[in-house]
Amino acid sequence: MFRGASAINLDTKGRIAIPVRYREPLQLEHQGRIVITVDIQSACLLLYPLHEWELIEAKLLKLSDTDKTQRSLKRMLLGYAHEVELDGNGRILLPPPLRQYANLDKRIMLVGQLNKFELWDEQAWLQQIDECQETIRSEELANNERLADFSL
């Protein structure tokens, strides 16, 4: 399980170093193989260990190619999907189309989301956090069916 936010840098070759605390689980449980694709609702990237991505692919396989919305979803997620592997220094290469999609520059945030990571431009991440806080403050959480029994 991946949790926490880490500030990392994108090098001049388009690589990022995965924080040390995640490298061993990624190597041992997933042979260092990661699939990167786009988030369809935000300007960020999603990084899935290969096994987790294969579960997504199984769901995508069940979608219709004749339904415009379902086909569009498949095109976005699969069309941008790139499989990468951790190198000996725990780095992965972010392909240029993915870097462009998420407007990634030098300063990046890697955010654990349990079974995957999100990869954000640092300024976009800070703005997203502000928006999340505003949403949480403005919504009546108890009226949200899925959150009604959620407690910290």
Swiss-Prot record:
- Where in the cell does this protein reside? Cytoplasm, Nucleoid
Q: Please list the disulfide bridges.
A: none
Which GO molecular function annotations are given, in alphabetical order?
A: DNA-binding transcription factor activity; transcription cis-regulatory region binding
Which GO biological-process labels does this protein carry?
negative regulation of DNA-templated transcription initiation
- Which Gene3D superfamilies has this protein been placed in? Transcriptional regulator MraZ domain
Q: Which SUPFAM superfamilies match?
A: AbrB/MazE/MraZ-like
Pfam families to which the protein is assigned, alphabetical: MraZ (PF02381)
The record ties this protein, via PANTHER family, to: TRANSCRIPTIONAL REGULATOR MRAZ
Annotated family: Belongs to the MraZ family.
Listed name of the protein: Transcriptional regulator MraZ
To which species is this protein native? Shewanella sp. (strain MR-7)
What gene is behind this protein?
mraZ
